């Protein structure tokens, strides 16, 4: 069995971690045979060390996703993986077993990653949307290129729906207006996401990060202090596990 340890963390917000994690869990039934993907995001080394004990360096690919290639947590875990690999396979392992997804090619080169193993992302790509960019390499490894293309076609379909559909039938617009109504007008401060499919268990953390980073602002574009709430606290749990959170029923 071919094992791949995917080390994936977005600068500051975790977008390139939560996105691929959510998608790959949701599309488990499309998983590429003989490829095992592990996500390493926390600076606490216990998770990484536990995974390293199970890995064969000869069959391990390390994908480092960082827009600036300077995030402390990212580089800390990347350096640990690098040391582990060099001790077992020597200097040549860097060109064979390490891939970077970044907007800072020079820093990736300085780390030891060769040009042909660097997938560049544009400056305007935010981490919370990065799963549609080169960060999606992790998803390609997990479900295969054809399934990933189908995934992109689905994303394009909803983009075109948003751009071309009249307001009264426009799903993203309606959901956005409802969010403003409940959060900024009715002043609700909490929103629970409860997916009733086990494969969507990571959807909660993805939406939490997506919305609370995008809309969680205390000032407007001109620097003026906001007088209304801009976002609710997003939380939740998987399916019937959430029924034991008694407060949600009150």
PLM region spans:
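Glycine-rich oxoanion-binding loops at beta->alpha junctions
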Residues: 23-24, 29-61
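Conserved phosphate/anionic-ligand binding catalytic regions in large, soluble enzymes, centered on
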Residues: 8-22, 129-136
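Short glycine-enriched loops at secondary-structure junctions
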Residues: 13-17, 43, 102-106
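Short, small-residue-biased leader/transition segments that mark boundaries at the very start
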Residues: 2-6, 250
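Extended, hydrophobic alpha-helical segments in both membrane/secreted and soluble proteins
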Residues: 19, 23, 48, 64-67, ...
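Short glycine-rich or small-residue beta-strand-to-loop segments that form or flank ligand, phosphate
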Residues: 7-12, 62-68, 190-197
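Conserved adenosyl
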Residues: 14-18, 22, 41, 50-52, ...
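Active-site phosphate/pyrophosphate-binding segments
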Residues: 77, 84-248
């Amino acid at each position: 069995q071919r094992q791949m340890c995917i080390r994936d963390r977005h600068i500051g917000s975790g977008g390139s971690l939560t996105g691929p994690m959510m998608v790959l869990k949701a599309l488990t039934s499309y998983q590429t045979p003989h490829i095992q993907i592990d996500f390493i995001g926390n600076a606490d080394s216990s998770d990484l060390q536990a995974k390293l004990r199970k890995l064969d360096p000869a069959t391990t690919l390390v994908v480092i996703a960082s827009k600036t290639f300077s995030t402390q947590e990212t580089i800390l875990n990347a350096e640990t993986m690098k040391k582990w690999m060099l001790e077992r396979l020597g200097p040549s392992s860097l060109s064979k077993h390490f891939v970077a997804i970044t907007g800072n090619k020079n820093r990736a080169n300085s780390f030891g990653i060769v040009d042909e193993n660097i997938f560049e992302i544009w400056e305007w790509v935010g981490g919370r949307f990065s799963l549609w960019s080169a960060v999606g390499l992790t998803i390609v490894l997990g479900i295969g290129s054809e399934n990933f293309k189908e995934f992109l076609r689905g994303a394009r379909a909803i983009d075109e729906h948003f751009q071309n559909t009249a307001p009264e039938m426009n799903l993203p617009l309606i959901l956005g207006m409802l969010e403003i109504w409940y959060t900024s007008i009715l002043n609700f401060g909490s929103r629970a996401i409860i997916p009733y499919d086990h494969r969507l268990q990571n959807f909660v953390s993805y939406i939490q990060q997506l919305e609370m980073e995008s809309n969680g602002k205390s000032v407007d574009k001109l620097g003026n202090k906001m007088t209304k709430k801009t976002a609710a606290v997003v939380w939740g749990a998987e399916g019937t596990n959430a029924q034991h959170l008694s407060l949600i029923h009150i």
